[in-house]
């Protein structure tokens, strides 16, 4: 039986997990909850056997996880993608944190009614944050060397054209194009992209 990945029907926190699963060619079943499925989720959440019921969740046999980073790390570990020594594992954790700084920066302003004002400061800081990744990629094939790791999927925009399984997924009907954030986000929310 294929593992089950449950989340809202948005890209959100689980998109890097989807990209990693697609890259690996690992079959999975997705349980998507639409914006009006709050009651459905509340009725299901305590029946799944999860220690900490939440979205996203990932059920792989007797492994039942919640929290996006725990899920991503579990899948990476299953496929020997967490680094081969303490130094590599620490660098991968560092990359996770650096990418999450950017992601949380976007989320912090995406749900704020003052988005247009706040985005100016964020966009001024963004080149400096991205420069660190550019410097790292200038001497590595991937973020942590010559082997793809899960932080690469967290920063997938830099890689999607070069990885055929990801390109295929992005062109499939399984790829969720919108919303980027939750439906209520000032930026990246709603039912359709801005025109």
UniProtKB/Swiss-Prot annotation:
Catalyses which reaction(s): RX + glutathione = an S-substituted glutathione + a halide anion + H(+)
Domain of life of the organism encoding this protein: Eukaryota
Binding site for substrate: 111
Keywords from the named record: Transferase
SS bonds (residue pairs): none
Residues that bind glutathione: 7-8, 41-45, 54-55, 67-68
Ranges where the GST N-terminal domain occurs: 1-83
MF term (GO), any: glutathione transferase activity
One Pfam match: GST_N
Stretches assigned to the GST C-terminal domain: 85-195
EC identifiers of the protein: 2.5.1.18
Function: Conjugation of reduced glutathione to a wide number of exogenous and endogenous hydrophobic electrophiles.
This protein's name: Glutathione S-transferase class-mu 26 kDa isozyme
Organism per entry: Schistosoma mansoni (Blood fluke)
